[in-house]
């Protein structure tokens, strides 16, 4: 085992860490790995180039999008996912759904102590294979768009939720509850008035995305989408919302596309908390192999694993490569 630790000191939950955080992590890892800092995603290429192929495990210590960027940098360098290192999220983001799914416990120092002990004992931690989404498309300037990810909020409520979520300086589980509570209160007080110029929290959140959507060759019978999402596995968002229950079994993708009224969305909140599928006459909430999204007017700004990408006019979503995640549990990350 050899550990490659990639630290983003600018991530929200790392900003308050001691100035010598990376030095502390290097002391934990010792001779069993390397710790590198990135000032931006532009630094990832050089860092991964130094770590691969020596590193058997790539540890992502950053914010919500850090693991996604690390996986995609590896994907851009090595086509065969079987040759990729094992990835390790460190619960450094605000939503942490990949770590929850893989049952990774603890923060970066505890996780690195467990991994270093495993390396010293020559007993690598157990691993779990997670499904991914592969997203291919086109931008407004005609460029090719290509990403690997686990969860997609291409438009509608799921996408606009993150606008409100990231307005908070320190978002987390409580922020999710506050966004939902304010949207419900605003909708109850004022409703959603089409074309109104009055600022309205609920109106922004419930504004639909206009697009032509085709799932497995069948067009969704509406161009108005308040739900436009995809998941490679069931997601526990901040320990509060349980999304994409139809993707709970390996190999099953969960697609959501279509329209649900704001009142219908609010009525379905208990189902989202409990991890149940949602229903609607103009909604497709199903398993599938491929979803194609073509915008009608405004480009998409999809959220992929908590990271926003602007200016997408066409997006094709299907199964991506399976990825190995090391399971560092509470019994070892202490």
What is the role of each PLM region?
Residues 16, 69-71, 98-100, 239-240:
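Short glycine-/acidic-enriched loop or helix-start segments at secondary-structure transitions
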Residues 38, 81-224:
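Catalytic core of DAGKc-family lipid kinases
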Residues 50-54, 143-145, 220-223, 285-287:
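Flexible, charged surface loops at secondary-structure boundaries
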Residues 1-61, 65-68, 72-77, 82, ...:
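ATP/NTP phosphate-donor binding region
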Residues 5, 215-222, 232, 238-334:
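ATP/nucleoside-binding phosphotransfer catalytic cores, i.e., glycine-rich phosphate-binding loops
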Residues 12-16, 160, 236-239:
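Short N-terminal binding/cap micro-motifs at the start of the first secondary-structure element
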């Amino acid at each position: 085992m050899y550990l490659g630790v990639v630290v983003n000191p600018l991530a929200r939950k790392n900003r308050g860490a001691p100035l010598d955080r990376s030095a502390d992590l290097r002391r934990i890892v010792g001779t069993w790995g390397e710790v590198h800092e990135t000032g931006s995603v532009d630094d990832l290429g050089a860092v991964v180039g130094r770590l691969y192929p020596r590193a058997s495990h790539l540890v992502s210590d950053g914010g919500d999008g850090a693991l996604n960027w690390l996986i995609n940098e590896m994907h851009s360098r090595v086509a065969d996912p079987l040759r990729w290192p094992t990835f390790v999220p460190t619960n450094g983001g605000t939503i942490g759904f990949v770590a929850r799914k893989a049952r990774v416990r603890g923060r970066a120092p505890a996780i690195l102590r467990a991994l270093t002990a495993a390396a010293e004992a020559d007993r690598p931690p157990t691993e779990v294979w997670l499904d991914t989404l592969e997203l291919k498309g086109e931008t407004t300037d005609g460029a090719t768009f290509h990403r690997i990810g686990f969860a997609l909020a291409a438009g509608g409520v799921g996408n606009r939720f993150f606008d409100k979520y990231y307005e908070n300086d320190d978002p987390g589980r409580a922020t999710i509850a506050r966004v939902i509570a304010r949207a419900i209160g605003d909708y109850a007080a004022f409703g959603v008035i089409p074309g109104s110029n009055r600022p309205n929290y609920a109106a922004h959140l419930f504004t639909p995305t206009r697009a032509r959507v085709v799932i497995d060759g069948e067009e969704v019978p509406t161009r108005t989408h308040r739900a436009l999402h995809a998941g490679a596995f069931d997601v526990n968002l901040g320990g509060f919302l349980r999304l994409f229950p139809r993707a709970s079994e390996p190999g099953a993708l969960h697609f959501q596309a279509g329209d649900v009224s704001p009142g219908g969305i609010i009525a379905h909140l208990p189902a989202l908390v409990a991890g149940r599928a949602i229903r609607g006459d103009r909604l497709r909430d199903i398993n599938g192999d491929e979803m194609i999204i073509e915008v009608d007017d405004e480009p998409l700004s999809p959220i992929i694993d908590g990271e926003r990408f602007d200016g997408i006019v066409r997006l094709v979503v299907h199964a991506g490569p399976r990825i190995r995640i090391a399971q560092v549990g509470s019994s070892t990350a202490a």
